[in-house]
Amino acid sequence: MTPSKLSGLKPFSAFLLTTAMLTVALLAFQPAALGQQGKGASSDDWFIKSAKDRKEQLQQGIKGGEKRDIIPSVPGSPIPQTDRLKPPSPDFLLAKVKWGKAAIIGDELTQDWNLAPNDMLEFHKKARSKGFKYMPTQTAIQDFSFNPALMPSILLGGVRELNFSPEGINRLRKYVLDGGMIVCDSVYGSPWFYESAKKLFDDMFPESRFRKLPPDHPLFHMVVDIDTASYSCGGEKEGGKPFMEGLYIGSRIGVLVSKYGLGCGLAGEMDVFEKLEANGLKPMAYSEETARLIGENLAPYIIGYGRVGEAEGKAELFGKLDENAPTSEFIFAQVKHEGAWNAHPGAARQLLMQLEKDSAIPVSLKRVSIDLNRDDISAYPFLFFTGLDDFVLTHKQIDALRKHVNSGGTLVVNNALGLATFHQAVVREMRRAFPQSDLALLPHSHDIFRNLNSIKRVKYTPTLMKDKGEQLQGRPVLFGAKVGGRLCLLYSPYDLEGGWNEVRYPLSRGYQSASAKQLGCNVIMYAMEH
């Protein structure tokens, strides 16, 4: 409304209208601190570029057929291991995805995806110093191949809300299921980006959900041990520990989200946080030192667990609960629970094929997934339970497990990757379910080690050998508990299932393939005979 029109109003009305207009104008220029606890009024408040693009170039990457180091087997002690690449081999490891809107900041065009323009330059410099000859690159989502063999992982970084078209969402989902990895960096710790990323991928993968990575997760120990973390801003709630969240696809992280910004720390450009705080925002980011340590571990994790993704990404046909299998046919029934219950897709089928080959037992090669909260499990005397981290059984699940073992069934529990958090959860939850039955180490003379295969010595993974080789002395380790005088609960604290897949799981604490299959077949035989 123009001043001439204002003058035609009654004085009091004109006063009210002028006051209202001034109020709106003042609200528009409120500092971001008036947003929710430093969140800002909108994600646009976070849209500040951290530094200018240095536009440095690295030398050319590796070529198809060239030899290179793969990954260290144990933290701090790289084992030289070369592998001839199958041409064409990717020259790229982690591509920065172009997404979001553009704006002019100062005299420079800036976009959501590139607020920390030098992060991938420094990430790849560090990776190349460790022998990984990959090149930094960028890709628009519409130009992306969505082929993990050509691009093992992609980076989505930003501060504003992450969103994609339905077609893009479907293609990203398939990319992850096929073995690709998506890394989401909130750059400055923007809650707008962080919350939208978690929602986007939670909706994209309804069969899984984000979980906090446990302290002994391979990502924190691939090359360097990240037992503690420092933060340039925020992080008070983490107690000096790293905080990362992953959405598991099998045993690998399909989508990794960093609530605390990584990009500025990777690039060594931290001045932007003072600007954000001056605007009333509360940024959250790792220190330069911790961000670079995470980056140092991320490169070998992508490579090593990319190979896991290739193996576990193959389609698996599950049996159905209503299929009337012959009563003499062995059915591998696996328990679904709130944790990462499907840690090694395809592994059970590999074991069952071995069992079918080595014995006269009729075997169904389709495993069945069981929900203890609602499914009738009376037709399945063998239940398999595995996971990667913490879980809590419901009262219904506990009742179902008690009924199962009291009816003559057997429960076999496996610690996928051999992580401490899952072990602690198993001990706690089995004590809740069977308070009168304690897990005890089975003696090496037990029948379970000599029914189908005579097992006196086993081979463990390099990480477990480094940690406990002298203590284990090559002896198989199984714990068991009796209910009503019958051994019906078996627990492997070291990963048994991973060895069935014949794929290398970096930093896994478990059995190597041949030993895992022999022991797995013996466990099934014992369960069927008792």
Question: What is each model feature region?
Answer:
Residues M1-S13:
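N-terminal secretory signal peptides that target proteins for export/translocation
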Residues F15-A28:
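Bacterial N-terminal signal peptides
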Residues G35-S153, G157-R160, L262-G263, M270, ...:
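Aromatic-Pro/Gly-enriched surface loop or interdomain linker
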Residues F29-G35:
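Sec/Tat signal peptide C-region and signal peptidase I cleavage site
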Residues A95-K96, P152-L156, M181-D185, F210-K212, ...:
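Structural recognition of the beta-strand scaffold that forms the well-ordered cores
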Residues S153-Y194, L298, F382-H423:
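Short alpha-beta junction capping motif
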Residues P117-H124, I169, R173, Y194-K198, ...:
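Extracytoplasmic/secreted envelope proteins and their assembly/folding machinery
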